[in-house]
Amino acid sequence: MTTLLSLLPLLLVIALLASGRVSALVAGLAGLAATLAASATLVMGNAPDAGGTDAVAALFRREVPAGLWLSWHVIAIVVTGVFFHRANQARAVAGSAGTIEATPRRLFSGCFLLAPFAESVTGFGVGYIIALAALRRLGIGGLPALLLGLYSQSLVPWGALAIGTTVGATLAGLTPNELGLLCALLQIPIHLLYLALYWRFAREAGLAVPLAQKLDDLAWTALLLGLVWLVNLASDVEIAAAAPTAFLLALRYWRDERPGLAQAQATLRASAPYVALTLALCATRLVTPLRDLLKPLWALKPFDNQPAFAPFYAPGFWLLSIGIAVVLIARAPLGRVVAETARGAWRASAVTLAFVLMAEFYVGSGMATAIAEALRGAAGRGAALGVPLFAATGGFLTGSGAAANAMLMPMETALARALALDPAWMAAVQNSVTANLTMLSPIRVSMGAAILALSASDAVLYRRAWPLALPPLLTGFAAILVLLARA
């Protein structure tokens, strides 16, 4: 009975999302309601006589504030990230349109550097929008553009300044840097497999990549992955993708375009908000005196097992500040930008709140542990092989690393402990696979089809795109097999 009650909310969410008839918000609210009812029932049943009501009240008093606090960290970046993007849209820099010659070097920069950079600093598909715009400038459209545009999501474990990784780390009992470092190692085989598929997609788009350029692509991919790992090790996880992609993008621009002074100045003006944001985030995390000043300044930490919130150190402060400056300099109507932000951010914020609260109650009520024990009893150590499938399903259905981690991380880390496996690596598999599979979520694919005005059916789109699921899934299964062999 305990296992069935514990599973019902998860199964309900998966069934609702898989049906395609309800949104992630409706599924999240239904899952939260079912979780609250199931956790209250189990806590009352386990409490001594006449003490059930008090136990349920204590559970709610403990988990609701904790869930709201963890949600706030995500929502603060959701709202400010959308505001930053809308501010740049309002800026409407002249001269950003027009087509340019398509070359393999420009295609690589757009797919693996420019678009992932945009996704890492704002998230929520913004990188995909920028990727499609860049591909159209290269004269690539239709289904090939949709497939290549999905590479904007190739560093999503660090997307939106790593909010999904931060949520996953908190629920797994790790620091964000610890989880980010493990995910950076898993991203190496994932990215190399992505690269092999990219060459095929580029050829199908009419832009075959010669051997010399493939070697060049490999070298830059190795450099990118090495820098992502290094930044995870030496700095904060929030900039682990933003800083390397920005640095390499500037380096590639200088090498490939050899711009004159006027062209370089025009490019700098067009990208000034992103340059300012990257410099601000890097300075506050790499310049020791500045970091030591801002990190404790007015910091709030109401829960010992949850991250602190330092308002002047948080990425959202810089997204908001630079976004406001962009609006004021462009003399755009601030009220309109705020209204567009509210319309664009409220749903993602509500989805995050529902799934994070659901996760808190799964942990606090013991339901995650109950499911893990049941899986161990039913499948033994082989139950661990289900983790990549759970993670892939969560990422595909929700389209959000934060939401999928909130839904699944408590159960999977509990399973790791029940099987005497390393919970940190189990958390890394969950986070890496679920984040990478968000690129194939119906939310992303339908967005690309709408922007490109594709008339092809979903079946046709997924028949071409499904190989992109293989790199994270194969890596996830391989990692679990290594964990089982070492245990």
For the regions a protein language model found, what residue spans apply to each?
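Hydrophobic alpha-helical transmembrane segments of multi-pass integral membrane proteins
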Residues: 103-133, 143, 157, 352-357, ...
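Membrane-core helix-loop-helix motifs of multi-pass transport proteins
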Residues: 144-250, 254, 422, 446-480
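Re-entrant/interfacial helical elements at transmembrane boundaries that shape
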Residues: 126-136, 163-174, 402-415, 444-457
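Juxtamembrane boundary at the C-terminal end of a transmembrane helix
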Residues: 479-487
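Membrane-interfacial loop-to-helix junctions in multi-pass transporters
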Residues: 3, 97-110, 138-144, 343-350, ...
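Short helix-coil transition sites and intra-membrane helix breaks within transmembrane domains
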Residues: 74, 86-92, 117-129, 155-162, ...
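Hydrophobic mid-bilayer segments of alpha-helices in multi-pass membrane transport proteins
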Residues: 5-15, 22-46, 74-81, 221, ...
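Transmembrane helical segments that form the transport core of multi-pass membrane transport proteins
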Residues: 244, 249-252, 259-394
